[in-house]
UniProtKB/Swiss-Prot annotation:
Maturation and modification: Phosphorylated on some or all of the serine and threonine residues present in the C-terminal region. Contains one covalently linked retinal chromophore.
Region called Disordered, residue ranges: 331-353
Family statement: Belongs to the G-protein coupled receptor 1 family. Opsin subfamily.
This protein's record includes keyword Transmembrane helix: yes
Record protein name field: Rhodopsin
Length: 353
């Protein structure tokens, strides 16, 4: 084995010289330069500085403006709530441990950080599944006269949290476990060991099949069918120009969220699977640290995509920030009016980008 395994940790360094210490008790500066830990702490501070205000603003603006409280936006708000959980429960913990160079908060802190990071990522993934299914049903119309309503949105929310908990909670109760990873200042699922009594192998396989491969397959199927339907509708001119534009722009926004999710999480998932299938092989602490911390940036991309691509939300946000007045009223107001008209015509009954 090209690492050192101990009680509830795995350090990617062979302890031939006796230098390796528990990441819960001692700084891990023998792994990388101390400056790297300072850089990680600064990075986490930046994510908190950006992630908390932008996600909180997304929630506040939607609550403040009644016209934004549409069923589809319930799912988008669900992403903001999940991101806030990651920021408050995970990022603050990781920033603090990075500043100390080891997981100074112990096993409890490791469980909290690992749980919130996993929960947030899974809520994002399953929310994208619900959005993809909604787009497919509304645009492709496999169910005639279907209208995505408030009850469907609430069921979608319950589904995303149930599935996310089914992935994030088991390591807390003994099916696998959360341990420090990479530079030992953030925690994740134990892909590294076959520790007796934790059944890591079965959990990792379960997680990759049920909580990564299957949801992504559903997403790709829905959007594959959706893109074909949009092209066919455009060619046949079956819908009004306003409705087609509305559906296309909502679809574009959700597809951008899927692409951003893959950019953030696919490197982490790929490295995790490689480590799991090559347990005992040699890899450095940075090998897992970079994709793990890159994945954490997912907390800011959803609201940014939403703000950039949804003119109605952007108009409401500017109005809120400017104390009820929009200095770009003429430009934004005209766009919002046209989008609101599109919303009333659209069979999805949403306020699209």
């Amino acid at each position: 084995m090209n690492g050192t395994e101990g009680p509830f940790f795995y350090v990617p360094m062979v302890n031939t010289t006796g230098i390796v210490r528990s990441p819960y008790e001692y700084p891990q500066y023998y792994l990388v330069n101390p400056a790297a830990y300072a850089a990680l702490g600064a990075y986490m501070f930046l994510l908190i500085l950006v992630g908390f205000p932008i996600n909180f603003l997304t929630l506040y603006v939607t609550i403040e403006h009644k016209k934004l409280r549409t069923p589809l936006n319930y799912i988008l708000l669900n992403l903001a709530v999940a991101d806030l959980f990651m920021v408050l429960g995970g990022f603050t913990t990781t920033m603090y441990t990075s500043m100390h160079g080891y997981f100074v908060l112990g096993r409890l802190g490791c469980n909290i950080e690992g749980f919130f990071a996993t929960l947030g990522g899974e809520i994002a993934l399953w929310s994208l599944v619900v959005l993809a299914i909604e787009r497919w049903v509304v645009v492709c119309k496999p169910i005639s006269n279907f209208r995505f309503g408030e009850n469907h949105a609430i069921m979608g929310l319950a589904f995303t949290w149930t599935m996310a908990m089914a992935c994030a909670a088991p390591p807390l109760v003994g099916w696998s476990r959360y341990i420090p990873e990479g530079m030992q200042c953030s925690c994740g699922i134990d892909y590294y060991t076959r520790a007796e009594g934790f059944n890591n192998e079965s959990f990792v396989i379960y997680m990759f099949i049920c909580h990564f491969t299957i949801p992504l397959t559903v997403v790709f199927f829905c959007y594959g069918r959706l893109l074909c339907a949009v092209k066919e509708a455009a060619a046949a001119q079956q819908e009004s120009e306003t409705t087609q534009r509305a559906e296309k722009e909502v679809t574009r926004m959700v597809i951008m969220m899927v692409i951003a999710f893959l950019v953030c999480w696919l490197p982490y998932a790929s490295v995790a699977w490689y480590i799991f299938t090559h347990q005992g092989s040699e890899f450095g602490p940075v090998f897992m640290t970079i994709p793990a911390f890159f994945a954490k940036s997912s907390s800011i991309y959803n609201p940014m995509i939403y703000i950039c691509l949804n003119k109605q939300f952007r108009h409401c946000m500017i109005t809120t920030l400017c104390c009820g007045k929009n200095p770009f009223e003429e430009e934004e107001g005209a766009s919002t009016a046209s989008k609101t008209e599109a919303s009333s015509v659209s069979s999805s009954s949403v306020s699209p980008a």
